[in-house]
Structures are given as structure tokens and as C-alpha cells.
Regions:
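The feature marks non-catalytic terminal segments
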Residues: 9, 86-220
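Active-site beta-strand->loop->alpha-helix modules in alpha/beta enzyme cores, enriched
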Residues: 1-91
Length: 220
């Protein structure tokens, strides 16, 4: 299900680190504590270091690790940020976290309150409140005569997760994706991210032309 979803989104690679989802919890230390024994933390850290070194990513995007996020998701985000922090500053990818919100959310445009975490004396979850968050409007139209929106792509990807019934409740939900820069990002991170979001606005596929056989739906 995850692989089908990522294929629809155009992901190039899926890497699973084979760690146990032992139960639902909002306590990240159930897996991050050195004596937790749930995840092989040494193997995870080594794998992340190797992946970042080999792939030389421009960006690392995590979920926003808030106190009410699933503890495993918090842990995964923090481990990724740890790996970025272990790199020389000039070689780091830009690190961002994402939240999806409704268009009428009271906290739209406000920075998320993240759990406090540090590694090797560097605060991992401090975020930059300026510039304002980089955003993607899921209601942005596309396709023939702008009949679809980006929300349709998100919904089709979510719909692949049939074994997790609660996931289907997110179909059609969420209007705005907000992306916040972490302080541990390298110099010029804001400018690099701004350039990336400009590129994301470019159409991914050429517009199709429909002949008169399409009747009133023919291209104009």
C-alpha cells in the first residue's frame, strides 16, 4: 500500500529501516531511550548517515514532531534531524517540517509547537519564524480546464492505505501544507527553499489537447 502510494506521488525510492511499530504511543522515549530495546537505534543512525552521505539530498522533510504526534513519528523525525546535525554545516541539506491545515484553521501561518530535543549540544527542533512558512495550496487547480485540484492527488495516495481504515478519513481533508525551516539548516536555506517552491509551481506534465471528438470537452 505504501509503495503504491509513493509510486503515484512520483517517489524515486522507498527505504524501510525494518523497525517495530510496537504500539500506539505519544511518548517518543518508548523507542528513543537508549535502554528501550524497541528499535535498533545504532543501526537506524548508521543507515541515515549512510543515506545522507550517498544521496546528497538537497532537502530533508519531516513531519512536525509535536507532543500529540504518534511517538514513533516524533522519533523518526528527530532521528532524521540528528543525522542532519551530524553533518558539517556547509554540507547539510535544508531541513523542514510539514503540517497540513484547513484553510480556516485558527493557527494558519503560526509556527507549530515542537517537542524540545537536542543532540551533541545542538537544538534539533528550533525553527525559524521568518520567513513565513512556505506553503502549497492543495486547492490549486490543474488538468484539463482546471477540473482537478492537488487535493485529488493527495486523496488518491491516501486511498491506497486500505488496511489502515482510519487513514481513509483524511481523504479530501487539509487545504494548506505549511513547511517550516529548522534552525540547523545550512546557510542560504531560505533562498534555496524559495527557489524550490518556485520550481514546484511549474506544471509537471504537458497539458493534453482534446480534439472535437471530445465534444464540449474539446480543448479550446
Amino acid at each position: 500500500e505504501q509503495r503504491r502510494s509513493l509510486e503515484l506521488l512520483g517517489a524515486r525510492m522507498l527505504v524501510r529501516l525494518q523497525q517495530t511499530d510496537h504500539r500506539y504511543t505519544q511518548d517518543r522515549m518508548e523507542v528513543l531511550a537508549e535502554d528501550a530495546g524497541v528499535w535498533d537505534l545504532a543501526a537506524v543512525r548508521a543507515s541515515l548517515d549512510r543515506r545522507l552521505a550517498e544521496e546528497q539530498y538537497d532537502f530533508v522533510v519531516t513531519l512536525a514532531p509535536t507532543a500529540t504526534t504518534h511517538g514513533h513519528h516524533q522519533a523518526a523525525s528527530l532521528l532524521a534531524l540528528e543525522a542532519v546535525a551530524r553533518m558539517p554545516e556547509a554540507e547539510r541539506p535544508v531541513a523542514l517540517c510539514c503540517q497540513v491545515k484547513a484553510a480556516d484553521a485558527d493557527d494558519l501561518g503560526e509556527p507549530p509547537v515542537l517537542v524540545v530535543a537536542e543532540a551533541a549540544g545542538e537544538e534539533l527542533t528550533a525553527i525559524r519564524t521568518t520567513p513565513a512558512p512556505f506553503t502549497i495550496d492543495r486547492n490549486e487547480p490543474f488538468g484539463h480546464r482546471d477540473r482537478l485540484t492537488l487535493k485529488a492527488i493527495a486523496s488518491v495516495a491516501i486511498a491506497q492505505h486500505l488496511s489502515q481504515g482510519t487513514m481513509l478519513g483524511y481523504i479530501g481533508a487539509g487545504d494548506v501544507e505549511e513547511y517550516w525551516l529548522f534552525d540547523l539548516s545550512p546557510p542560504l536555506a531560505a533562498a534555496r527553499t524559495a527557489d524550490w517552491f518556485v520550481q514546484l509551481q511549474d506544471p509537471s506534465f504537458p497539458e493534453r489537447e482534446y480534439t472535437s471528438s471530445a465534444g464540449t470537452n474539446a480543448s479550446r
